[in-house]
Amino acid sequence: MTNIRKTHPLAKIINSSFIDLPTPSNISAWWNFGSLLGVCLILHILTGLFLAMHYTADTTTAFSSVAHICRDVNYGWVIRYMHANGASMFFICLFMHVGRGLYYGSYLFSETWNIGIILLLTIMATAFMGYVLPWGQMSFWGATVITNLLSAIPYIGTDLVEWIWGGFSVDKATLTRFFAFHFILPFIILALAMVHLLFLHETGSNNPSGISSNSDKIPFHPYYTIKDILGVLLLLLALVTLVLFSPDLLGDPDNYTPANPVSTPLHIKPEWYFLFAYAILRSIPNKLGGVLALIFSILILAIIPLLHTSKQRGMMFRPLSQCLFWLLAADLLTLTWIGGQPVEHPLVIIGQLASILYFTILLVLMPIAGIIENNLSKW
């Protein structure tokens, strides 16, 4: 009798995706982040569902309802902080996952890579709208500043901003629609993640060596299920530690002040995971130029496959490209630091230099390094 997991229409899909999936035998811990992102997403959908049961999307009661969740709902504070800090974990895993893709040349699976970019943009939009919901000072002013960037679009900009706001300022209509979108988008992300996996399983996983692993595949279960469970336990350990010991470490104190349209906070800044893009935005004095740089800082990922000049897929045996990759990582950390600082003399120029370096590494230096390494290999 054939095993039911290989014949049942539903079980067959799960079996071919998570049990009998032929997987390269040499993939490292850098390949764990895909499953960790799945865990983060499920955790978010569950905690978000329970938060939505108690939250009210109204400007007069939103702030109070979040306080009520933390004070009066059984373990509401755990749910709220798991959701908020879970977002930080989500973005750490995302950056690691994208970084792994860049390092090992996974972007040459173009369909998987492009769906991944769409996923990244959707997750960023979802996180931004979620940050607006508690209706604190930083929620309100963050929403005002970021949505206002659309007014830089010629001709239709102002109309577009007012259409998104649902009025002439960020108000009740804005909050209500942001809540509606914040609720529905994670399910769209879940569907996109399935498409992401579908395209990945068409080609099979990449591996650290960058060469075909068809001659050496092992079943996903039990080898990588065990490995993924270890990753999940470490992720949850980090998240629970953060939630129980310093839940406000990554948040902004301004968000504990109810939103006040007539009082602007001293430094308006987004959550830490958007600071690198915010620094790039601020480093260009022109509004439209800044917005374009902000958008291109993410969309640049889409042209990475076109800029691949090396004969080798990954960077495992390419020391020059490795140096540039880690320089890029350091540059992104610098941008993250600058994004959280006030706009003052030495910091502005550091931000501008870091922004120029970011685009130069990706657009110019890495393709050149690939060509140099191709020629070096002939010696």
From Swiss-Prot:
Cofactor(s) needed for function: heme b
Record keywords: Electron transport, Heme, Iron, Membrane, Metal-binding, Mitochondrion, Mitochondrion inner membrane, Respiratory chain, Transmembrane, Transmembrane helix, Transport, Ubiquinone
Q: How is the cofactor bound?
A: Binds 2 heme b groups non-covalently.
Protein's membrane topology: Multi-pass membrane protein
Q: Which domain of life is it from?
A: Eukaryota
Pfam families on file: Cytochrom_B_C (PF00032), Cytochrome_B (PF00033)
Q: Name one GO cellular component term.
A: mitochondrial inner membrane
**GO MF annotations in UniProt:** metal ion binding; ubiquinol-cytochrome-c reductase activity
Q: At which positions is heme b b562 bound?
A: H83, H182
Binding residue positions for heme b b566: H97, H196
Query: What residue ranges are annotated as transmembrane?
Result: 33-53, 77-98, 113-133, 178-198, 226-246, 288-308, 320-340, 347-367
Q: Where in the cell is it found?
A: Mitochondrion inner membrane
What SUPFAM superfamilies would the database entry show?
Answer: a domain/subunit of cytochrome bc1 complex (Ubiquinol-cytochrome c reductase), Transmembrane di-heme cytochromes
Using the record, list the residue span of the signal peptide; answer none if the entry has no such feature. Answer: none
Q: Give me the residues that bind a ubiquinone, please.
A: H201
Swiss-Prot/TrEMBL GO biological process terms: mitochondrial electron transport, ubiquinol to cytochrome c
Looking up PANTHER family in the UniProt record yields: CYTOCHROME B
What quaternary structure, including any partners, is listed in this protein's UniProt entry? The cytochrome bc1 complex contains 11 subunits: 3 respiratory subunits (MT-CYB, CYC1 and UQCRFS1), 2 core proteins (UQCRC1 and UQCRC2) and 6 low-molecular weight proteins (UQCRH/QCR6, UQCRB/QCR7, UQCRQ/QCR8, UQCR10/QCR9, UQCR11/QCR10 and a cleavage product of UQCRFS1). This cytochrome bc1 complex then forms a dimer.
Similarity comment? Belongs to the cytochrome b family.
What else is on record for this protein? Heme 1 (or BL or b562) is low-potential and absorbs at about 562 nm, and heme 2 (or BH or b566) is high-potential and absorbs at about 566 nm.
Briefly state the protein's biological role. Component of the ubiquinol-cytochrome c reductase complex (complex III or cytochrome b-c1 complex) that is part of the mitochondrial respiratory chain. The b-c1 complex mediates electron transfer from ubiquinol to cytochrome c. Contributes to the generation of a proton gradient across the mitochondrial membrane that is then used for ATP synthesis.
Q: What is this protein called?
A: Cytochrome b
- From what organism does this protein derive? Tremarctos ornatus
